[in-house]
UniProtKB/Swiss-Prot annotation:
This protein's name: UvrABC system protein C
A Gene Ontology BP annotation from the UniProt entry: nucleotide-excision repair
Gene Ontology cellular component terms for the protein in this record: cytoplasm; excinuclease repair complex
Quaternary state and interactors: Interacts with UvrB in an incision complex.
Keyword DNA damage: yes
Length: 627
């Protein structure tokens, strides 16, 4: 499109946006921003669509970062009017999950985490489910840590004889003796309601206790069970009292494992966030009756330009939309909430209290600065930082693994290799004006260095400077003799050099009867040479295959240079010692191994020198440095 054509189009688009802004209602709802391709790039919620959407287009000089970039890409928008803020919040959450807009913070979905369910049926069962359904059952969770979930299930199993069968225990089925008791009854894991051996009233009292336990009310349960045990004892029902005593002991052991973090016994949720350049982590502590029952992590992507306060609000909205936990008395925060954010959350709480028949509470939001509560927030923040660091390490590893795989796949395709080059060996030569000629061989397996298979070679078949002869020697020594049996064959050989080095290496392999794919990588303009092609070719600078080849070539060069410097240093150090009468290279090297340096040899006592090299040699060295 010519620039003259584009300008009127932009003007028309801006005019259409202005007209559309004038039609917005002052109602709660969700808005979607689209780019010129029609793709949804941002989804937001508002209690007043007119004010919220218009705010993006007023005073654009005050916008910065991601929001400014977003506004420059808005070509159109759509709104969906809802009946309440809570409905807008739910709709926004679902749309972000489905559409994954570019400029929205992406919060990791908890849909894979399990819930505990008390089923809605006569004689309810306790089940684990990963899918929530509105079927009248009572739901708890999600449980982000399987250890916590199984710990609770083990406790329930040790205290309460809940049925595990799938029988439909209607009054008619029980009365007609349709079912028989199973093994659980005989090992005292169930009281046999299927045969009418336990009344529904007694069973539901047990379910009420389990519900109390799952809500974290262990202290209340202990008091209740203690009273019941004492009552049965007074009524001389000692068998029932002993049964409750065993339940109490299990419950107390479970309660002792829970960390007491607040002495006032209140129910609290604690929120904190930690952010990096692009990612963040929110942590929620669930405190019930002063005990820390568990925590939940919510990871976030695309957080660049977002404030900690805004991210904290997003974490809270997601958590309370999805959790089935009982609402707390108090919420401790790392950052203060904005007025709109607090209003949205309170509306959500009211909806949850109504839908889930929870006790109505006037929940307090606090940002503590000192004392026990501030310590809880700081502990939560430290956990968020720790989990974010772990997440970033794993993300980096996943990224590296992906790049390595892409690099190997690209190499296979570009070089028409018969299989993925899982093992690659790379060679490099190093010398200084023909002296101390060395070669290195490094090995990469699955895109990573395998240092145990690195080898270094001191070239000894000629004197002077001859890169081709050095390449012939190192290829021959690697792929024949003892090394050929100690190390597996590579899927690809890379040599540092051009057409000449590649051809010499290729001819040497042919002489050994080997057919291994081989290429050369020239340093100057990163040209790739193969034995079959007359001319080299180049890879794009961003190619993962080129980056992998460069990494290997540079590693081989580093390894060769390090070995070359070591040999040169030893030779230079030995020169001074070998000027002493009666000392050859072997003796000089032995002295350097023993003392570490020429200076240390010079400072050694006559006794130390005698122990290292014998009396005659020691006397010569001692007199040389002490004339």
């Amino acid at each position: 499109m010519d620039i003259e054509d584009e300008l009127p189009a932009r003007t028309d688009r801006k005019k259409a946006l202005v007209e559309k802004l004038g039609t917005l209602p002052p109602s709660p709802g969700v808005y979607q921003f689209r780019n010129s391709s029609g793709r949804v790039i941002y989804v937001g919620k508002a209690k007043n669509l007119r004010n919220r959407v218009r705010s993006y287009f007023r005073n654009q000089q005050q916008l910065y970062g991601k929001t400014l970039v977003l506004v420059t890409h808005i070509a159109d928008f759509e709104v969906i009017i809802t009946s309440s803020e809570v409905e807008a919040l739910i709709l926004e959450n679902n749309m972000i999950k489905e559409l994954k807009p570019r400029y929205n913070v992406n919060l990791k979905d908890d849909k894979t985490y399990p819930y505990l369910v008390i089923t809605n049926e006569p004689f309810p069962r306790i089940l684990i489910s990963r899918q929530r359904r509105k079927d009248g059952s009572t739901w708890f969770g999600p449980y982000t840590e399987s250890r916590q979930l199984h710990s609770i299930l083990d406790l329930i199993g040790s205290i309460f004889p809940v049925r595990s069968c799938k029988f439909r225990l209607s009054e008619e089925n029980i009365a007609t003796k349709k079912y028989k008791v199973c093994l659980d009854y005989h090992i005292h894991k169930c009281k046999g309601p299927c045969e009418g051996r336990q009344s529904e009233e007694e069973y539901l009292l047990m379910i009420a206790e389990i519900t109390r336990l799952l809500k974290g009310k262990t202290s209340t349960m202990i008091r209740s069970l203690t009273s019941a045990m004492q009552l049965f004892a007074r009524e001389l029902k000692f068998e029932r009292a002993a049964e409750i005593k065993m339940q109490l002991e299990s419950l107390k052991r479970y309660a002792e494992r829970q960390k007491v973090v607040a002495g006032d016994g209140l129910d609290r949720d604690v929120f904190a966030v930690a952010t990096g350049e692009e990612d963040g982590c929110g942590v929620v502590f669930k405190i019930r009756e002063g005990k820390l029952l568990g925590s939940q992590r919510i990871y976030m992507n695309n957080v660049t330009g977002e404030t900690d306060s805004g991210l904290q609000a997003r974490v809270m909205e997601k958590y309370y939309l999805e959790t089935l936990e009982l609402l707390p008395d108090e919420i401790l925060l790392q950052e203060s909430l904005g007025a709109d954010e607090e209003e949205t959350l309170r509306a959500l709480f009211s909806e949850k209290e109504r839908e889930e028949a929870q006790e109505k509470k006037n929940i307090r939001f606090l940002v503590p600065q000192i004392g026990e509560k501030a310590h809880l927030v700081e502990m939560c923040r430290q956990n968020a930082r720790h989990h974010l660091e772990e997440y970033l390490i794993q993300k980096q590893k996943r990224g590296e693994a992906a790049r390595e795989h892409y690099g190997l796949t690209a190499l296979k395709e570009l070089l028409h290799l018969p299989k993925l080059p899982q093992r690659i060996e790379c060679f490099d030569n190093s010398h200084l004006q023909g002296t101390d000629y060395v070669s290195s061989m490094i090995c990469f397996e699955k895109g990573k260095p395998k240092k145990a298979d690195y080898r270094k070679f001191k070239i000894n078949s000629f004197e002077g400077s001859d890169d081709y002869a050095a390449m012939e020697e190192v290829i021959r020594r690697r792929y024949s003799g003892s090394l050929s049996s100690k190390l597996p064959w590579p899927d690809l050989i890379v040599v540092d050099g051009g057409k000449g080095q590649v051809n010499i290496a290729f001819q040497t392999l042919n002489a050994l009867g080997l057919s291994i794919p081989i290429i050369g990588l020239a340093k100057r303009i990163e040209e790739i040479f193969t034995p079959q092609a007359r001319d080299p070719f180049n890879l794009p600078k961003t190619s993962p295959a080129l980056k992998l080849l460069q990494q290997m070539r540079d590693e081989a060069h580093r390894f060769a240079i390090t070995y070359h410097r070591k040999l040169r240093s030893e030779r230079m150090l030995q020169t001074e010692l070998t000027t002493i009468a009666g000392i050859g290279e072997k003796t000089a090297f032995k002295l350097l191994e023993r003392f570490g340096s020429v200076d240390a040899v010079a400072q050694a006592t006559l006794e130390e020198l005698t122990a290292a090299a014998g009396a005659k040699t020691a006397t010569a060295i001692y007199r040389f440095y002490r004339p």
